[in-house]
Curated annotation (Swiss-Prot):
Family the UniProt entry places it in: Belongs to the bacterial ribosomal protein bL28 family.
Name of the protein in question: Large ribosomal subunit protein bL28
Species whose genome carries this gene: Buchnera aphidicola subsp. Schizaphis graminum (strain Sg)
Gene Ontology MF, one: structural constituent of ribosome
One biological process term in Gene Ontology: translation
NCBIfam families, alphabetized: L28
Source lineage: Bacteria, Pseudomonadati, Pseudomonadota, Gammaproteobacteria, Enterobacterales
Amino acid sequence: MSRICQVTRKKRMIGNNRSHAMNAKKRQFLPNIQYHRFWIPEEKRFIKLRISAHGMRCIDKKGIELIIQEIGITKNKG
């Protein structure tokens, strides 16, 4: 599974490791992706998201309901 935040769409970046001699070696910069469950009081259920630390701060600021509308997650049929 790819390391992409479901809220901010952050993903890995490619860059260089640099030695003291300034030799370049390719490397990856990975986002801080975590699984987190959020309670949705209107639907009386939990939702599990794979989000970055920045995505968690966005949810704290805006609220889970607004973020769910922005990313387009709908109710489960069941």
